[in-house]
């Protein structure tokens, strides 16, 4: 399906792959695989034309974006050092996810959030990811609504993955009634799966993952469909430097984007590229104008984490 194809027509080639893998099932691992191919084709397209992907998508609305440091929650008595390390790195926004939250009772949940707010202070944005896509997630709408009310008291920016990832009707009710923005959809694949969530306003913030949905070709279409329905695009990015570089190009090309996810600490983000991503004094990330994704490999870092020796063709 790929041999002999053009390497500078990512949208058409990716759509061909979606169409011709129909019998293997649309979505899931097949779409994850296509995502990697699509991102690579966009990088090639950018390098051939000597343009950043964001410009090839239609233009750049910004040159910097606020990253939120994304980290796993811990019990309140041991959590502060992890939060302090993120603040020390320069993050002005932090998302806390999974860990014990939602798994050991409401008192534990509030103690974690109270500790986090007291640790980072009033000027750092806090986001909460309950991890409702975790296996056997036990909670439904009533828990999510009451938890959202608690989070509002601590000035949490958004509440993510409060319900199981396929609970469309629950999310519609929660988004309508919660006192703070609701975010979800990181596990969905292909733009067709996102349409009911956007068109029925099931979330305030939509979170496609470029390494899962079909790559840049699909995610840009999802982001602009959300924009047309006044839903904020916040890309999910719990992956590698390639995912972050792709997300940065996307948020540059979407009019209302405000944040990008940045795992912290993140050896698979920081160690495998020649020029690591760095936050400026305002806590923002610059969005590269170099061709393609705007990154080059650090072959030593790739070898250290994967055992692979990069050849010239890999670079």
Predicted region positions:
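C-terminal extensions of enzymes
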Residues: 273-315
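Glycine-rich, aromatic-flanked loop segments that form ligand/cofactor-binding clefts
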Residues: 38-76
